[in-house]
Amino acid sequence: MTVRLAPLDYSDLKRCAELERILFAGDDPWSESTLRAELDHGHQYFGAYVEGVGLVGYAGISVLGTLRDAEASVHTIGVDPGWQGRGIGKALLRALLAVADEFAAPVFLEVRTDNEAALALYQAHGFGRIGLRRRYYQPSGADAYTMARPAVVGEKAQKDGTT
C-alpha cells in the first residue's frame, strides 16, 4: 500500500464531508461548505490518497502571523476508519507540523479527552496538555484537552534568520 500526501483539492471536499460525518457523528461534523471556506481562507490542507481507492484521510492547519511571530492551529485530522492504524494519521500530522516549522510557530490543537489514539499520537510528536475545555464538542458535550507543541525552527525560518 502506497499512500501519497498532496494538497487537498476542492474536488475532494465531498469525500471529506462524508468522512467528517462518519468520524464525528456524535458532534458537529464539518460540512462541505465549511471545508470549502477553510480552503478559501488559505489554510493548508493535505489529503492522503491511495491508488485505486482515492482519498482516505485529510488534515488541515492554519498559520497566523508573520514568520517572526507566527502561531499555528491544527484544525482537523481525519482518517477513514478502514484505513486507521496504518500510519496515515501520523503522516498527515507530520505534514502539518512541517508547515508550522517553516514559520517557527508553536502549534495548538484541541482533542477529545477520550480519544486515546489521538492523544498518544500528539504526545509522541511533542504536544503536551495545557488546558481542559469542558463540554467543548457539541452536541455530545465531550470535553477536550487543549494541547501545544513548542516552536521548532524549520529550514525556511533558519534561512530567514529567525533563530
Predicted region positions:
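Extreme N-terminal starter segment of soluble prokaryotic enzymes
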Residues: 2-5
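Acetyl-CoA-dependent GNAT
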Residues: 7-84, 90-101, 150-156, 161-162
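Short secondary-structure boundary/hinge segments and terminal tails
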Residues: 38, 101, 117-118, 140
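Short acidic/glycine-enriched loop/turn segments that link adjacent beta-strands
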Residues: 67-70, 115, 137-143
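Conserved glycine-rich acetyl-CoA-binding loop
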Residues: 76, 80-94, 112-120, 124-125, ...
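Conserved GNAT acetyl-CoA-binding A-motif
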Residues: 100-110
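Conserved catalytic-core motifs of GNAT/GCN5-like acyltransferases
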Residues: 108-110, 128-145
